[in-house]
Amino acid sequence: MKERTSACRHGTPQKHPDTSEESQAMESVDNLCSQYEEKVRPCIDLIDSLRALGVEQDLALPAIAVIGDQSSGKSSVLEALSGVALPRGSGIVTRCPLVLKLKQLKQGEKWSGKVIYKDTEIEISHPSLVEREINKAQNLIAGEGLKISSDLISLEVSSPHVPDLTLIDLPGITRVAVGDQPADIEHKIKRLITEYIQKQETINLVVVPSNVDIATTEALKMAQEVDPQGDRTIGILTKPDLVDRGTEDKVVDVVRNLVCHLKKGYMIVKCRGQQDIQEQLSLAEALQKEQVFFKEHPQFRVLLEDGKATVPCLAKRLTMELTSHICKSLPILENQINVNHQIASEELQKYGADIPEDDSKRLSFLMNKINVFNKDILSLVQAQENISWEESRLFTKLRNEFLAWNDYIEEHFKKTLGSSEKHSQMEKFESHYRGRELPGFVDYKAFENIIKKEVKALEEPALNMLHRVTTMVKNAFTKVSSNNFGDFLNLHSTAKSKIEDIRFNQEKEAEKLIRLHFQMEHIVYCQDQAYKKALQEIREKEAEKEKSTFGAFQHNSPRKELTTTEMTQHLNAYYQECGRNIGRQIPLIIQYSILQTFGQEMEKAMLQLLQDTSKCNWFLTEQSDSREKKKFLKRRLLRLDEAQRKLAKFSN
């Protein structure tokens, strides 16, 4: 709940006699506001309505930011534009960003003001109380002294004599820490200013005293860094009465854009000084005094004639600039609103439909969630899941594993046949264990032992592949659960538990089948026709190879080499058939147990959850952050929907 207090009027300000000059000045201001209303009011109404909707939470809206070096007179410029006395003095005066929202009332309506910061909202009944309330707010936010804060203070002013406008007063740039300020005060202030002036929707008013070298001004340098072309930067020279005699022509050159070029150029104003305030010079009188100053000044008179001097001319210029800037920003603003709307809609869609209040509908809702989950699992099993361009389907990953397995088998048997160790073993058998068989005959027992040993060596790699594939499938199923049940902590947790239990059982069953298959592979067997064909092809290839190598020359191979060659041919023939069998059968076992049966068991397990209707509410308990996120997205969509309607109405 916001704290609401009322700043009472303490005493009545001293009234000055109503002179004809003051009346003319006030009439000038009223005419200015009238022009402003005719030209800008429709645009400002649109932006204000968007701001009232809270669209600034989603994107930036057109505004005017006033920046300047410390004590450059920027607060005085805001004061002159708004008709409200703001904190002023030496050192850092603006210690928090001040959002000044001006609202024009009809003639005769009463002035009112409001200061809003954090959870505090203070009604102000008279302009003379504004400065005190701003100082109080700054002390509460940034603390007593000269520290700064990035927390906003909002000052709303409603008056017949102000235009509809939003201005932002930012802390003045300082270079040396004083008092209780942190050593990095300059960096903090610059970072705070940059957050505002870098937005393309912000017009930057760079305030520079007339009696300093503009080329060395830090404020102008910062503005040029974020706006190199000067498309949204206006230079404002202040304190022309403090210019040293003889340097007036240099000031004129600056205002005429001849020194430090800005696309939007410069203007010059003379606001109330400290002595004027002490003498209680009113803002209307200050405008008249400013007019007389420029009109009678021998060098600056020409700037008044060019429309580049005085606060009324500045206000008129800002009217045109802001109107143009808003119109220029509207297409971009409309596009940003549409993009943000689409993003929010897509994000909200991921959270799914709202949970029904009725119990029977809630059960139907849960059933639908589980059915969608089961369909997604089935799509994974059937290699029909929807994926992005950068992703790969689950079965594609498994197929790559199976292809790598087949390559591994071929490489394994190839190394076996070509290994010097195996040739040494066969030669040792020929030398030490050969029986009655004639040269060239293969000892079947030796042949069988070699086959068993090499096939056995493939068992652990097969199990390793099983574990890799199981992990892939488990992760894919878990991702489906997360996509479908991610907002429902209990349902997602239950699904993950089911996935883990079924994974364990199916992996265990697949491991038993793989080990059983390798036990069967220890029985050396092959269909006669297949084995004969493979052996014949191997012998023909080797004969062709020998023929091309030695030509017609027939050589007599030693007895040992003959037996070894024969054994190698038989091993090669058997490996071809055995390798095909293992290369096909192990992937089939894994697909059946880890993909197909796993998916079927998951479907059964999830449907069984519907049997216990008492747990329906428990399963559909949403995570608190999900609920808040959905509420946030719905509020954003409502804002953006209304913003789209207002923009469409404005365009029409």
Swiss-Prot record:
Q: Please tell me one Gene Ontology term that the record gives under cellular component.
A: nucleus
Q: Which GO terms describe its biological process?
A: defense response to virus; innate immune response; interleukin-27-mediated signaling pathway; negative regulation of viral genome replication; receptor internalization; response to virus; synaptic vesicle budding from presynaptic endocytic zone membrane
Stretch list, region G1 motif:
68-75
Q: Where is region (G3 motif) located? A: 169-172
Region annotation G5 motif: where it falls in the sequence: 270-273
Q: Reproduce the UniProt comment on modification after translation.
A: ISGylated.
| SUPFAM superfamilies given in the database record | P-loop containing nucleoside triphosphate hydrolases
A GO term for molecular function: identical protein binding
Source organism's superkingdom?
Eukaryota
Q: PROSITE patterns under this entry?
A: G_DYNAMIN_1, G_DYNAMIN_2, GED
Membrane topology according to the record? Peripheral membrane protein
For the region Disordered, give the residue spans: 1-27
Question: Which annotated residues bind GTP?
Answer: 68-75, 169-173, 238-241
SMART domains according to UniProt: DYNc, GED
Residue ranges of the region described as G4 motif: 238-241
Induction conditions: By type I and type III interferons.
What keywords sit in the KW lines?
Antiviral defense, Cytoplasm, Endoplasmic reticulum, GTP-binding, Immunity, Innate immunity, Membrane, Nucleotide-binding, Nucleus, Ubl conjugation
| G2 motif: region residues | 93-95
Bundle signaling element (BSE), as annotated region? 332-357
- Transcription regulation among the record's keywords? no
Query: Per the record, what about its domains?
Result: The C-terminal GTPase effector domain (GED) is involved in oligomerization and viral target recognition.
Cited PANTHER family: DYNAMIN, INTERFERON-INDUCED GTP-BINDING PROTEIN MX1
How is the quaternary structure described?
Answer: Homooligomer. Oligomerizes into multimeric filamentous or ring-like structures by virtue of its stalk domain. Oligomerization is critical for GTPase activity, protein stability, and recognition of viral target structures. Interacts with TRPC1, TRPC3, TRPC4, TRPC5, TRPC6 and TRPC7. Interacts with HSPA5. Interacts with TUBB/TUBB5. Interacts with DDX39A and DDX39B.
Q: What is this protein called?
A: Interferon-induced GTP-binding protein Mx1
Q: What is the lineage of its organism?
A: Eukaryota, Metazoa, Chordata, Craniata, Vertebrata
